[in-house]
Amino acid sequence: MRNKKYFEMACQMEKQSTKHSSAMVSPNQSLKLGLKPWVGESPYVLILGTLPSDISIKSQAYYQNKSHNSFYKIMEHLFQRSVGQSDEDFIISNHIALWDCVKKANRKGNLDANIKDDIPNDIKAFLQIHPTISTVVLNGGLAKKKFYRSFPVSDFSERIKVISLISSSNAASVKFEEKLEEWRIVKYIIDAQTRVHKD
């Protein structure tokens, strides 16, 4: 019965995401629509950004502005990546889900600071559909701000931990080595959850 409920919720969210993505190109060029989540069968960590860059929206894939964002560089230091593996397969194969705090917003250019009139994604419902997720990771200060503005801590059960990390964006004036060291917690969480689910 519980699985049926999750399945129905997942189908509803998928319909909304498909409808949402098909409306990606808008007459209002400042209106930016986010992507559907990347998620596999048993995610342990949900990483939330703010809103994808224009390059990512155009390609319908997360963190594609790779000259200005170190996300995949960080992930490749933490997890082994197979030759020729797509970004999405690489992420979900390591029990990570990707999404954003913002579903849609007005934004001129790529800067998160320019986001206005934003509408949040239904992250609470997403976590209900994917009960294996134990930790939400907020990618940067603005993602943290957007998340807590829309979702008070009381909205989540005690089993969900929420942590904020230095932004993977190169706009964050922090050395890569410092970012990598802070982001290692993602690997620790994945490894710990893998052991729990094996027992």
Can you name each region flagged by the protein language model?
Residues 93-146:
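Internal catalytic-core helix/loop-beta-alpha segment
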Residues 55-115:
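Short, surface-exposed acidic-centric catalytic microdomains
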Residues 75, 146-147:
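Hydrophobic packing residues within well-ordered alpha-helices of enzyme cores
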Residues 2-44, 53, 65-67, 111-124, ...:
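C-terminal capping/extension of enzyme domains
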Residues 51-55, 69, 103-106, 141-145, ...:
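Short, solvent-exposed loop/turn segments at secondary-structure junctions
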Residues 42-48, 58-61:
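Short beta-strand segments
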